[in-house]
UniProtKB/Swiss-Prot annotation:
GO terms for molecular function: histone H3K4me3 reader activity; histone H3K9 demethylase activity; histone H4K20 demethylase activity; iron ion binding; transcription coactivator activity; zinc ion binding. Fe cation binds at H249, D251, Y321. A zinc finger (PHD-type) spans 5-56. Its EC number is 1.14.11.-. Residues 545-560, 575-630, 725-753, 910-919 have a biased composition (Basic and acidic residues). One of its GO terms (biological process) is negative regulation of rDNA heterochromatin formation. The gene is Phf2. Belongs to the JHDM1 histone demethylase family. JHDM1D subfamily. PROSITE patterns: JMJC, ZF_PHD_1, ZF_PHD_2. It comes from Mus musculus (Mouse). This is Lysine-specific demethylase PHF2. Residues 197-353 form the JmjC domain. Residues 448-630, 719-755, 811-841, 871-1080 are annotated as: Disordered.
């Protein structure tokens, strides 16, 4: 039995759990604990000698380090870097002076630190509590020390220890660290900062402050029965020896932290979480040599805060800080997430993800805590709406930040990284939609309450408008300018449009006096940033009042949606406003529903000045959303009515409906948190933010349709031309299709074009569903030929060839006024049909005649040209192809390219059928027949010279077509029955030249389109093919017989003719049923033309 080897002075076998070192002299192994060598010291030893070898070989030698300036205690030149945490670094840090933290740290007694205090003053700066009285903090007695920690936590507990000098982490057992702590000879500086003891017996001795319990997301909103356990980040024990240093960092997840010093003292170096500082921190932390750079030297100010025994320090989210322990210290700490600074928490979390930091104090499942908080916020919003109360602004803002983070986490490309932290039984898309809806409702309710408070204060200042113009309000007073601007907007709207107020608004205000409004307009100056597309140059813009109001409202929260139409148009009476606000709260959901239904029509029909103004509002998020829209709307209407010389209608209902429609649609200025939704259903927003790409004008037919219902214009062609000029742009960013929400426009097209009602809506919808691309004289030219070919290809696949015709006809009639379209169509026909017959030319001439008649009718009618206009006439007799005979349909279905000048109607009867495998192409068969006939004739002539036997008469002069067809059928039979003859290698030389194949294809296409062609016509076509193939065949048999055959063609198939009597053996081998005679074989070939459609 083999003995187990033993090692070391203790003579014990090898133990994998114990550190061992080899002696370089005797080559024996020794336990580190037996010879007094620590595992962390072993890398610094160059040559090790055991205690026995030290007597003969001397002591162990250490490695010669070239970077002792980083860690050594001696003085070094200034040009060399110093390692953070080294003895030299600590000495330099102690000697430095920093700004006092009294400027940024608030001293608050524990009894005053409540949730109300936090919400009122915010939690953006550190808070120092001198004593723990009233704080609700529970900690052990001051006699509690490190040995007690080992007793209550357990000596075998593995802890993460930081080597301060090297700024590296390692693991030790707690008992080993305690032994190091109490040792008198500390060779290294070790630091324990993340001993989380919430699941140990020591947890009963420590309780976080009450304010932490009330604010913490994990403590309040994380379910106890959740599948993922709560993160254990609330109770940490810090055991730090003298000169322990923790470099600058941001707590994981942007969490806030609390520190209580039980024994000793700690120094905090604090840096504000400004944007510049966070960017500098991210750059510094990502550098490879960041441990040799002191981060405080890169920022403008770093504050020094000393926390002594018995004091508690609260550090807000995002603060960058480092800690130094001047004396041995025992402290307790904890981290928590809260709703007072959600944005900073998210930013710090994103920085942490980008840097991929592996902090010792990680905040596990940070995203899960955010999901639970989002669910809680949704319930809080619903409860506040039921009770009629409003949530605090920081909660609304936090909900926005969280909802934006939820959307980014649930995107398709990012879901794989974040789905692990998604709570079980959660529906993230539904939560995002509901939360966005509640945020929007809460914002709308808060905006309707604001005018109530400010209405009385603003009524006095509205009376004297001239004084306001001379002495504009101070930027500090934000409320009066808002109210004043609302009333001035009312004045300008009513004065410019000259229409009564909508009847549905209760208690409409008295129209203002004209002199004041005129003064305001005449004295206006172009100051501040204005919209270029809002009005024409002849119409004045906003005056100094707008500039001062913009400046005054910059400090206010920019409203995402200017949703105060009723309070804007009502008198500043508190009771009236209160009643209206109550009505608004009840009608919020109905308004959102009506808005989602009317969004499509309004987006496609409102004036361009409104579209441009809304684009600037979305991009710049200006606080004057509603008022800008109101001014732009009035100016645009004034310009529109003046340019067309139309008298405004006297009925108040038109402008009332129009104005309410305008307000309902202009109020929502969408942001990333908004959804257009009903009470329970999600409405997809088809209108993303428009980009400024196209021409500034747009379709104004929405306004014209409403006016046409009440008055008839004096000159209808003038009105149509004006509308035609205004409709000269299409949004390049997105293509909008609207067929069923514009009955008025469709009716107008029907009335003016004079076509039948049957089928016009189908053609309108077909043309718009395909693309509805409109090209007018003032707009851009049509797409390139390659783009048009691609469009036509897609249309042909969908059997919708009408749209291309509309597209070409529209551009042609607009540009050439009748002449260029015919040339364009002729050019297209000429390019595509070079090899067609006379029948196609006759049809083309007929189409061009019809086109000229149609263009003449088009110019006489001066039709309304927009996306709904259908240029082709609808009186064609091909509207009902079902009742046409089969022969008539076959007659007009030549295999010709699509002509853009043809009349638009339903598709021709025969449609493209899918390619079937195993079918033979007729053109190849024809070429094979011609080649086989030629081969047969050559062999017959050879046999005629050799033997004087009896044979069939040759069709030299008398009947060339009949004999050629017979010989062609004979050759085709021999070629087609051989498998090799159907391959491309054999068929291509058989046709002799490409011209022969193309000619055969064109001839076959003409003959194949007739319904029941007789055999004579086909035999003659085969003969014609041979005589006209490539110009190499003569008109006689002798000329063809002298032609040599192409190399490699039919070499394996050269056999005598099937009609020869000397070929009986071969004839018996190849005979099949129905293929015995030449007539039967010819009939088989002709069945291809009889039943199939020839596709080239």
């Amino acid at each position: 039995m083999a003995t187990v080897p033993v090692y070391c002075v203790c003579r014990l076998p090898y133990d994998v759990t114990r550190f061992m070192i080899e002696c370089d002299a005797c080559k024996d192994w020794f336990h580190g604990s037996c010879v007094g060598v620590e595992e962390e010291e072993a890398p610094d030893i160059d040559i090790y000698h055991c205690p026995n070898c030290e007597k003969t070989h001397g002591k162990s030698t250490l490695k010669k380090k070239r970077t002792w300036h980083k860690h050594g205690p001696g003085p070094t030149p200034d040009v060399k870097p110093v390692q953070n945490g080294s003895q030299l670094f600590i000495k330099e840090l102690r000697s430095r002076t920093f700004p006092s933290a009294e400027d940024v740290v608030s001293r608050v007694p524990g009894s005053q630190l409540t949730v109300g205090y936090m919400e009122e003053h915010g939690f953006t700066e550190p808070i120092l509590v001198p004593k723990k009285d009233g704080l609700g903090l529970a900690v052990p007695a001051p006699t509690f020390y490190v040995s007690d920690v080992e007793n209550y936590v357990g000596p075998e507990r593995s802890v993460d220890v930081t080597d301060v000098t090297k700024q590296k982490d390692c693991k030790m057992k707690l008992k080993e660290f305690v032994d190091y702590y109490y040792s008198t000879n500390r060779k290294r500086v070790l630091n324990v900062t993340n001993l989380e003891f919430s699941d140990t017996r020591m947890s009963s001795f420590v309780e976080p402050p009450d304010i932490v319990k009330k604010l913490s997301w994990v403590e309040n909103y994380w379910p106890d029965d959740a599948l993922l356990a709560k993160p254990k980040v609330t109770k940490y024990c810090l055991i730090c020896v003298k000169d322990s240093y923790t470099d600058f960092h941001i707590d994981s997840g942007g969490a806030s932290a609390w520190y209580h010093v039980l024994k000793g003292e700690k120094i905090f170096y604090l840096i504000r979480p400004a944007s510049a500082n966070i960017s500098l921190y991210e750059r510094w932390r990502s550098a490879s040599n960041h441990s040799e750079m002191f981060f405080a030297d890169q920022v403008d100010r770093c504050y020094k805060c000393t926390v002594k025994q018995g004091q508690t320090l609260f550090i807000p989210s995002g603060w960058i800080y480092a800690t130094l322990t001047p004396v041995d210290c025992l402290a307790f700490a904890g981290h928590f997430l809260h709703s007072l600074s959600v944005e900073m928490q998210m930013r710090a979390y994103e920085v942490e993800r980008r840097l991929k930091l592996g902090s010792l104090t990680q905040f596990p499942n940070f995203e899960t805590a955010c999901w639970y908080m989002g669910k809680h916020l949704l319930e809080a919003f619903k409860g506040s709406h039921k009770s009629g109360k409003q949530l605090p602004p920081h909660l609304v803002q936090g909900a926005k930040i969280l909802n934006g983070a939820f959307r980014s986490w649930t995107k398709k490309q990012a879901l794989a990284e974040h789905e692990d932290e998604l709570p079980e039984h959660f529906r993230p898309s539904q939560l995002i939609k509901d939360l966005a809806k509640e945020i929007r409702l809460s914002e709308n309710a808060s905006k309707t309450v604001r005018p109530e408070v400010n209405a009385a204060a603003s009524s006095d200042e509205v009376c004297d408008g001239d004084r306001e113009k001379e002495e504009p309000p101070s930027p500090v007073e934000t409320t009066p300018p808002r109210s004043l601007l609302e009333k001035v907007s009312k004045k300008k709207t009513s004065k410019t449009v000259k229409m009564p107020k909508p009847s549905k608004i209760p208690k409409p205000p008295k129209s203002p006096k004209p002199p004041k409004t005129l003064k305001l307009k005449d004295g206006s100056k172009k100051k501040g940033k204005k919209c270029k597309e809002s009005a024409s140059p002849t119409i004045p813009n906003l005056d100094l009042l707008e500039a001062h109001t913009k400046e005054a409202l910059t400090k206010m929260e920019p409203p995402k949606k200017g949703k105060t139409p009723k309070s804007v148009l009502s008198v500043p009476n508190k009771d009236t406003v209160h009643t209206q606000n109550d009505m608004e709260r009840l009608e919020i959901r109905e308004q959102t529903k009506s808005k989602s239904e009317a969004k499509w029509k309004y987006k496609n029909s409102k004036p361009d000045s409104l579209l441009k103004m809304e684009e600037e509002q979305r991009l710049e998020k200006s606080p004057l959303a509603g008022n800008k829209d109101k001014f732009s709307f009035s100016f645009s209407n004034r310009k529109l009515l003046g340019s067309k010389a139309l008298r405004p209608p006297s009925s108040p209902g038109v402008f009332g409906a129009l104005q309410s429609f305008k307000e309902d649609k202009a109020k929502p200025v969408r942001d990333e948190y908004e959804y257009v939704s009903d009470d329970g259903e999600l409405k997809i927003d088809e209108f993303p933010i428009r980009r400024k790409k196209s021409a500034p004008k747009r379709d104004l037919s929405f306004l014209l349709d409403k006016k046409e219902a009440l008055l008839m214009p004096t000159s209808k062609p003038k009105l149509d031309s004006a509308v035609y000029k205004s409709d000269d742009s299409s949004d390049e960013g997105s293509l909008h299709i609207d067929t069923d929400t514009k009955p008025g426009r469709n009716a107008k097209v029907k009335k003016e074009s004079g076509s039948s009602a049957a089928g016009i809506l189908d053609l309108l919808q077909a043309s718009e569903e395909v693309g509805a691309l409109e090209y007018n004289p003032n707009s851009q030219p049509p797409a390139s030929p390659s783009t048009q070919e691609a469009i036509q290809g897609m249309l042909s696949m969908a059997n919708l060839q009408a749209s291309d015709s509309c597209l070409q006809t529209t551009w042609g009639t607009g540009q050439a006024k009748g002449g260029s379209l015919a040339a364009h169509g002729a050019r297209k026909i000429g390019g595509g049909n070079k090899g067609t017959g006379k029948r196609l030319l006759k049809r083309t001439a007929k189409n061009s005649v019809d086109l000229e008649d149609y263009e003449e009718q088009d110019h006489l009618d001066a039709c309304f040209k927009d996306s709904d206009y259908v240029y082709p006439s609808l009186e064609s007799d091909e509207d009902n192809p079902v009742f046409k005979s089969r022969s008539k349909k076959r007659k007009g279905s030549d295999d010709a390219p699509y002509s853009p000048t043809a009349r638009v109607g339903p598709s021709v009867p025969r449609q493209d059928r899918p390619v079937r495998e195993g079918t033979r192409v007729a053109s190849i068969e024809t070429g094979l027949a011609a080649a086989a006939a030629k081969l047969s004739q050559q062999e017959e002539q050879k046999n005629r010279k050799k033997k004087n036997t009896k044979r069939k008469p040759a069709p030299n002069t008398a009947s060339p077509s009949i004999s050629t067809s017979a010989s062609a059928s004979t050759g085709t039979t021999s070629a087609s029955t051989t498998p090799a003859s159907t391959t491309p290698a054999s068929t291509t030389p058989a046709s002799t030249t490409p011209a022969s194949t193309s000619t055969a294809s064109s001839q076959a296409s003409q003959e194949g389109s007739s319904p029941e062609p007789p055999p004579e016509s086909h035999s003659s076509s085969l003969a014609d093919h041979e005589y006209t193939a490539a110009g190499t065949f003569s008109g006689s048999q002798a000329g063809r017989a002298s032609q040599p055959m192409a190399p490699g063609v039919f070499l394996t198939q050269r056999r005598p003719s099937a009609s020869s009597p000397n070929n009986t053996a071969a004839k018996g081998k190849r005979t099949k049923k129905g293929m015995a005679t030449a007539k039967q074989r010819l009939g088989k070939i002709l069945k291809i033309h009889r039943n199939g459609k020839l596709l080239l």
